[in-house]
Amino acid sequence: ELTDMLRGSCIQSTRSCDPNPSIKLIKEAIKSGKKFKMISVDDFPDDGIVVAVQGIGGGGPWEYVIDRTKSQGLKVLPDSERNNMVVDLISEFLGKEVTAIIRSEAAEATATALLVAAERNIPILDAGITGRAVPEVQQSIPWISGIASIPTAIVSPWGDEIIIKHAIDEYRVEDISRAIAVA
């Protein structure tokens, strides 16, 4: 079923997506004893906390930032470590454990959500915050439905931790997040 989900997610993404690396990661996780559990939105508790773990594409740190951090010997953390740091950061900020992970978009982000959920031994929610991709935060299904993304937790490639606890609207969440992504 997971293989089918990852293949279908690549079809849904409508871009050049090779599901095989994601399938390999999921199979390795299963071999190492990880369990995958998916729950329906109907089974999600009203007081539960769900987190979408995602990256910010369309750029990245400015070249001089990359050069400087290399000269400082700063280590770039693996995505898996940063993804789990985001979940810990939001959980710590809210004072509650995260109940489930939700995928942020199709393609590789589906595998990311599955792996974070399995690593934490929590379910993935059978849903997503976008249909295909996340061009910008204010174009996500939750915001269109009146659900804000605040608070937002961000972990930089080097492990800096940032919480956006208040923003005027999702447009500002997008602006602030993009500014952090290039810093």
What annotation goes with each model-predicted range?
Residues E1-A183:
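Non-transmembrane, aqueous-exposed alpha-helical and coiled segments at domain scale
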